[in-house]
From Swiss-Prot:
Family, similarity comment: Belongs to the SpxH family.
InterPro entries: Adapter_SpxH, Thioredoxin-like_sf
Taxonomic source organism: Staphylococcus epidermidis (strain ATCC 35984 / DSM 28319 / BCRC 17069 / CCUG 31568 / BM 3577 / RP62A)
Subcellular localization, as worded in the UniProt entry: Cytoplasm
Protein name according to UniProt: ClpXP adapter protein SpxH
Predominant location category: cytoplasm
Protein's job: Adapter protein required for efficient degradation of Spx by ClpXP under non-stress conditions. Interaction with Spx stabilizes Spx and exposes the C-terminus of Spx for recognition and proteolysis by ClpXP.
Superkingdom, taxonomy of origin: Bacteria
GO cellular component terms, A-Z: cytoplasm
SUPFAM superfamilies documented for this protein: Thioredoxin-like (SSF52833)
A Pfam entry, by short name: Thioredoxin_5
Coiled coil: none
Known partners and oligomeric status: Interacts with Spx.
């Protein structure tokens, strides 16, 4: 297994003053413009489904100079700076913020679009975030302070690239396990099982239509990751949902997407 991991290091989190909140806590450092980070989000979704009782994932936009410069270059104001927008979204809850960044990545990666205020606005509303509160929060100085905290965490964990995951057990004095880059799904399940030290009963994924309804927009690759069905069978089930007017197929240069026509649950 060690040979399969190109870079896997132990890092302590004692100096970051972070408290464990679950059996296994996973810190996910991402670049919103990275295709590998986009692909990893599907793997993290599957981990959350199967190991829901055993893990908690915390997403942190990698506050490196390279990523923040890219966020600034893609923006015309604070409103469409995705780094600041993500921090403002976090003030209304991490779940909503994660939904927001998922929707944003679905916009900017497959379509290769630049970020606009309209795009931010649509994703904010679709993520269930209060738009007026979001606009007010964007003006607060504490967003910059929050980015500085993320930078401190990234430096303490010696994060040098995105995606990077750092796994921690519930013992705050134990070192974390850092995994840089993108790997097959079984690598991450191996790590979780090793850290737990006991067999884990995995949950089954929800019905296909419920998953798409919750996510609103998903890639074909994500669905193949979540369900592990033969592609022919998955296409057959998606066709059924299309005929039932529950989903619609979208085609972009980066691949095939499926959009829910059902109200968000």
């Amino acid at each position: 297994m060690a040979e399969e991991l190109r870079i896997m290091e132990n890092k302590s989190r004692e100096d970051t003053n972070l408290s464990p909140v679950s059996k296994i806590e996973i810190y996910s450092f991402f670049d919103p413009f990275s295709k590998d980070c986009f692909k990893l989000s599907a793997i993290l979704s599957k981990l959350r489904i199967e190991y829901n009782k055993y893990i908690k994932v915390r997403h942190i936009l990698n506050p490196s100079l390279k990523v923040l410069t890219k966020c600034q270059a893609q923006s015309t104001s604070d409103f469409d700076n995705i780094a600041l927008a993500y921090k403002a979204a976090e003030l209304q809850g991490r779940i909503r913020a994660e939904r927001f960044i998922h929707l944003m990545q679905n916009e900017i990666i497959p379509k290769r679009d630049i970020i606009t205020e309209d795009m931010i606005s649509d994703c904010i509303n679709n993520a269930g975030i209060d738009y007026q509160v979001f606009k007010e929060d964007l003006q607060k100085d504490k967003l910059t302070d929050s980015l500085k905290v993320d930078l401190h965490i990234a430096r303490e964990m010696e994060i040098e690239q995105a995606p990077s995951l750092v796994f921690f057990s519930e013992n705050v004095h134990e070192e974390g396990l850092k995994v840089e880059g993108l790997y097959p799904y079984h690598i991450y399940t191996y790590i979780i099982n090793e850290l737990m030290g006991q067999p884990i009963e995995k949950n089954l994924p929800p019905k296909l239509e419920y998953y798409i309804q919750k996510k609103q927009l998903v890639t074909m690759e994500e669905l193949l990751t979540i369900y592990e069905w033969p592609e022919k069978l998955l296409n057959k089930e998606l066709k059924k949902l299309t005929l039932q007017q529950k989903v619609e197929k979208l085609q972009y240069p980066e691949g095939e997407f499926w959009k829910s026509k059902m109200p968000q649950c």
